[in-house]
Amino acid sequence: MLPGLAAAAAHRCSWSSLCRLRLRCRAAACNPSDRQEWQNLVTFGSFSNMVPCSHPYIGTLSQVKLYSTNVQKEGQGSQTLRVEKVPSFETAEGIGTELKAPLKQEPLQVRVKAVLKKREYGSKYTQNNFITGVRAINEFCLKSSDLEQLRKIRRRSPHEDTESFTVYLRSDVEAKSLEVWGSPEALAREKKLRKEAEIEYRERLFRNQKILREYRDFLGNTKPRSRTASVFFKGPGKVVMVAICINGLNCFFKFLAWIYTGSASMFSEAIHSLSDTCNQGLLALGISKSVQTPDPSHPYGFSNMRYISSLISGVGIFMMGAGLSWYHGVMGLLHPQPIESLLWAYCILAGSLVSEGATLLVAVNELRRNARAKGMSFYKYVMESRDPSTNVILLEDTAAVLGVIIAATCMGLTSITGNPLYDSLGSLGVGTLLGMVSAFLIYTNTEALLGRSIQPEQVQRLTELLENDPSVRAIHDVKATDLGLGKVRFKAEVDFDGRVVTRSYLEKQDFDQMLQEIQEVKTPEELETFMLKHGENIIDTLGAEVDRLEKELKKRNPEVRHVDLEIL
């Protein structure tokens, strides 16, 4: 049996290199002459000469079908060889003509993925930093004329009073400073000289306070301060000034009564009035300090000075008022002293009761008015120490009225029974009352200084105002703290809707121009430039959205003075 002809194809090879004929004969015995005859009949060389071709291809060989040979053996007789379907000369020549036809070559299309090269910025990168003109002049020892030659960039202003301001690239300023001064060492020497000159200049200014104030006003480091005198004609300042005047007079007359009578209860009341007068003077100092305008060292202002002065006042009441009253009462119990006529003491206590009661009414009316304005109850307003100065006056005058009642009662018992121990017990009672007041003041003012949240209803209102904006998805980590003087600081993490922010940017763009820019993009570098341009503008739009929300919060809630919205 003759197996099939195995064919393989390759470009630009002859017919003889593509066709290979293997003949196998299964005859048990075959004469060499017969075998040679058969091989001469069907030879690869003669067949290849029959089909001359210089450009064969794989698909054409399927048309050539050869062969099969039947070898019959009868004993030792001769063999017959038969070749089936051997191609004729015309067929082979047709195949050769086909193979000579030029091949149709199609262009190869290879998809290559464009990858943007990653930039390595390192641990420190300042090439894109902006600085203001003032910083450029001060830090790099330049002049205004030097900055005129640099590229100017307009950016959004972080201050409420201006919309935008001019900045410069830090790299441009550094290059300009090196051009002016020649080397970093020369620049460092110049900065050192200017620093020394500035220190010397300030030392000269400190010798004259008037020149120093004019210098600060000229530089604009601080805004004009509020007149402290006007603070004491309204609100808590008015209450404090009334209390200082009345308690000062009461202290003077109580000391006269104590000197005249020698009563321990009267001594406690005199000490009580003295401590009240000193503490209220401290409150007045805190009020005058709290209205100062914020400066670079205290960016959130001095409103906490009211709480600080109230805290010190509470400590002073405990040490001076309660301590001396307990000491004098204990000494009266251990060493009783005879008491003179108490008539003048009763008169002074009566006058003190009237005056302290009047001051108490002034403080109560002020607190009620403020509590009503805040939408809070009187009790809650007092317990949370929303107005620390008036709170101190309220508690001190309440303690003063109760102290007068305690002292008058104990002195009356002493007058009736003639036992001075009742008078000493009255001194201990007044001291205990002052200790309770001081403990309450220390606790409430400490809580206020630690940072206290505003009312939950107010926090909810501020949060809903932000959540109702289309550009906001969600609000997280809300913190709203009371800074004192009716000022609130609001902080929140804001999850912005990127689609809304992007649409806000696109609404201000010329779509025809953008479409033309897109059509001009042909290379990855051009695509990068296009994306960076609009990406930076979208980031600026996001910053503008943050500024808009902050202004909206302050406009609808005047008590909110500081807003920090962080992008989540």
Swiss-Prot record:
It catalyses: Zn(2+)(in) + 2 H(+)(out) = Zn(2+)(out) + 2 H(+)(in). It comes from the Eukaryota. Residues 1-67 form a transit peptide. The chain crosses the membrane at residues 239-259, 314-334, 342-362, 392-412, 424-444. Keywords: Antiport, Disease variant, Endoplasmic reticulum, Ion transport, Membrane, Mitochondrion, Nucleus, Transcription, Transcription regulation, Transit peptide, Transmembrane, Transmembrane helix, Transport, Zinc, Zinc transport. GO terms for biological process: intracellular zinc ion homeostasis; nucleotide-excision repair; positive regulation of transcription by RNA polymerase II; regulation of mitochondrion organization; zinc ion transport. Belongs to the cation diffusion facilitator (CDF) transporter (TC 2.A.4) family. SLC30A subfamily. This is Proton-coupled zinc antiporter SLC30A9, mitochondrial. It comes from Homo sapiens (Human).
